[in-house]
Amino acid sequence: VIAYLHFQKESYVQHLIHEFKYHKNERLAIYIGRLAAEDLQRDGYLTDVDLFVPVPLHPRKMRQRGYNQSERVARGMASVCHHPIDTTSLIRHTYTKTQTRKSAYERSQNVKNVFSVAHPERLAGHHILLIDDVLTTGSTLLNCIDALRDVPDLLISIFVVSTVI
């Protein structure tokens, strides 16, 4: 797991995350993705990645928010290193409420079995970079990985904009 920033309450990182996640600042998410990709590419972390896969939002959440912040981060990263983005193979088929005030156990239960793979053939044999905005307990990412488990010859790396300290 590569975490670009460290999230602490009342910090500038919290402000940045809230800006692009809750205040519709899509361009900030794209910009952070570009900055991260420049650093990761310079340090050789993206050389063998084939495909970016942002953690999907449920369609209802997508309508509420207007965009997927993880997809916007991926778009910024792709503008630097020109990797394709797959937004249709991994899907979130169950709507869940926000995890921000849930315990680790509640988070794990909240996202259990909410992801599935619609197009495993698009991912088979590839090295993907699974992209999310914030890593807190890892429940969301672990459930994404669980959904991807049966895709043949799939290598998964993970990038998050920030991790909670």
Per-region residue spans from a language model:
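Extended interfacial segments that mediate partner engagement and assembly in macromolecular machines
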Residues: 1-76
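Short, well-ordered alpha-helices that flank and scaffold nucleotide-derived cofactor binding pockets
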Residues: 38-42, 75, 79, 142, ...
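A local structural micro-motif
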Residues: 25, 48-49, 85-86, 156-157
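A short coil-to-beta-strand element that immediately follows conserved catalytic motifs
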Residues: 51, 81-91
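PRPP/pyrophosphate-binding module of the type I phosphoribosyltransferase fold
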Residues: 87-165
